[in-house]
Amino acid sequence: MAMRTRLTWQQEKCLQNYFGGKRFCLLYKASVQKFSHQNLLCTCENQGPTMIVVYSEKCVIGMYLKEGFQGKDVSITIFALQETGFSLCAKGPDSPYLLFHKRKTNDFSILLDEKAVIVSSAICKMLQLTARNNVIPIQECEAFRCEELLDERKTRGIAVLHSNLLQALRDYKPYGDLVQQTRVLLLGPIGAGKSSFVNSVKSVFKGSITHQILVGCDEDGISDKYRTYSIKAKDDSDPLPFILCDSLGLGENAGLHTDDVWHILKGHTPDRYQFDSMKPITSNHPNYTHDPLLKDRIHCVVFVFDINSFEMHSSELVAKIKKIRRDLIKHGILHLALLTHVDSLDLITKEDMTDIYNYSPVKSKLEAFHGVFGFALSDILVVSNYVSEWQLDPVKDMLILSALKEILYTANEFLEDLPLNK
């Protein structure tokens, strides 16, 4: 029968995040392999980075050895997980072997044969522990090998997927050659990450981080013009066959006017048009496109939301967005939702992001978003935009490219469904 850790899912995620996104492989469990420091040390030698965890009645205490058990002094991080939170302190360099023996000079010892941890008053204070006579009884002890979450095999798989997605998007063609470039409109609340998504797509295809579009945290939004952005692949002078259209954010009483949405959709709004939230564009505007062609129209709409804040939008803004959705459905315009900042969800790790749609907290967020806005679960995409990074990350790239692929395929479905006279 396989051993199972006593760590809860939340405790494991907290430790993974703090210690650099590690996978914990259970090596030793005292209740199975006896409360014996000899058994523990024999199991843990030459295993690389190691974590020892003991369970008391009220908390979890442990130590992390980045260099593992070696015949030399190493740096040790002692930590405690309690209902009130996570606390830690650094110790050493010291011999990890000696921490399993009772010594007067030890300020922290794990005595397995006595089922107790000896903790000095100073460490108790730093870790906010309560110890009677500096002794904490323990019920269990476990040892883990700490592995990199993204092992070489998985890293190779991500690289292959990244390459395949890039090639698929380079080979993408609008349905039936009806247009040279499909147009995708990004709509959503102020600060949701619309402009950052455009920057992120540009960065992935360029092969380096770019911040061509100004982004920020202004409460009224940074984008105040209608902008159309073509994307170029690295070392390619020709733009790719799609255009990302950025707009002023939607607000409760301010932001993008709903009438402007329809002028954009129908292809009347020129690039660099300056929005006025109180006054939508009219046919009297000098650059108004009076007879737009199919190439000028929007072929797919993407509603962009911050995955951490969509549940906090006012009922007025939610109603406004739902009204736009109903009108899109009425006119047969296909649309998707894109949830940004998925990497900032509590306790998420890089490995979780490699299988993001099966990650339990993301699934819960998608269900919640479906409940608020009514999007089908299959129409909700998630990404992590490049906001403050200076280097590309293959896992982020994979999410961005996967989302873009779904968006462009949806645009093709719209073009395919057009009446012949369109």
UniProtKB/Swiss-Prot annotation:
Keyword Ribosomal protein included in the entry's annotation: no
- Location in the cell: Cytoplasm
Any one GO biological process? response to bacterium
Q: Which SUPFAM superfamilies match?
A: P-loop containing nucleoside triphosphate hydrolases
Residue stretches making up the TLDc domain: 1-147
Q: Which UniProt keywords apply?
A: Cytoplasm
- Transcription regulation among keywords: no
Q: Which GO terms describe its cellular component?
A: cytoplasm
Tell me the function of this protein: This protein aggregates to form microtubular structures.
Family label: Belongs to the IFI44 family.
Q: Which named protein is this?
A: Interferon-induced protein 44
List the top taxonomic levels of the source: Eukaryota, Metazoa, Chordata, Craniata, Vertebrata
